[in-house]
Amino acid sequence: MFKSSKKEDSSKKNHNNKLIFAIRKLFSPIKNFFRQTKTPDNFFGVIKRLKINNQKMTLDECNIFANLLKIKDKTIADIMVPRSDIAAIKLTTNLEELSESIKLKVLHARTLIYDGTLDNVVGFIHIKDLFKAFATKQNGCLKKLIRKHIIAAPSMKLLDLLTKMRRERTHIAIVVDEYGGTDGLVTIEDLIEEIVGRIDDEHDQQLDSDNLKVINNSTIILNARVEVEVLEEIIGEKLKNDDEFDTIGGLVLTRVGSVPAIGTRINISENIEIEVTDATPRSLKQVKIRLKNALNSG
């Protein structure tokens, strides 16, 4: 049986909470200072006041703090992905058609779904949900896989959008113009990166085209550094029984005992075969995951 999406939603919620907690903790030494003092808009003025009050910040803290001062005036229009760069799928596309199209074009971790035209976005699908549907041989349209998004105007402040995303518990906002047409999109990762810089998310493992590629309904390609839990969530099968390894590469090395050569195939379970597609003499780089049941049934 495949795992419920409740665990995934809970994991995302916990991850977002941890990120917000980390940002709050980062500024705890100066929290009281801001409550008692009028905050100057000039960054260097703030640093001078902190120095006078014997408050210290690391270089990373200074960079994040500078970004926070800048972001307060930024709007969605400053960072959104424009309409021309949006990748989306028609609502009428069925899973069988999508399985075939994936062979030619790799989807993003989150892909928008529209009804009729891009001006009528109905939500988005996550690539992990899509592969689960393939693995369980689900048929029909994409409606049952769609997750909700929110609507925002280009003029909305970024901090207001971040608050709204947390309240609505969604990761994507569709930006609309004055006529209601789709102008662009913004993800929660875009917002956080405006504050802390580029994030290498060890929980989601940046499930983009660099780390996870769906080839068809029985095959995916994974970066060997992707955590085992990510694969477990996708296929709904427990692969890790202890803390001996964390990544897909660690799983393979534990089973084989050394770095296998390219082309080596390892049976991880009755239903899962891993093939090494990229490796050096010292490390595993990339693997191909095959679901045998799906192959045999096809």
From Swiss-Prot:
All residue ranges annotated as the CBS domain in the record: 80-141, 145-202
Gene3D superfamilies, sorted: 3.30.465.10, CBS-domain
Cellular component GO terms, alphabetical: plasma membrane
GO molecular-function terms, A-Z: flavin adenine dinucleotide binding
Keywords from the UniProt entry: CBS domain, Repeat
Matching SUPFAM superfamilies: CBS-domain pair (SSF54631), FAD-binding/transporter-associated domain-like (SSF56176)
Origin superkingdom: Bacteria
CDD domains with a match to the protein in the record: CBS_pair_CorC_HlyC_assoc
UniProt keyword Plastid present: no
Statement: the UniProt record of this protein carries the keyword Flavoprotein: no
Miscellaneous: It is not know if this bacteria is hemolytic.
Family: Belongs to the UPF0053 family. Hemolysin C subfamily.
UniProt name for this protein: Possible hemolysin C
Organism per entry: Rickettsia canadensis (strain McKiel)
Gene label: tlyC
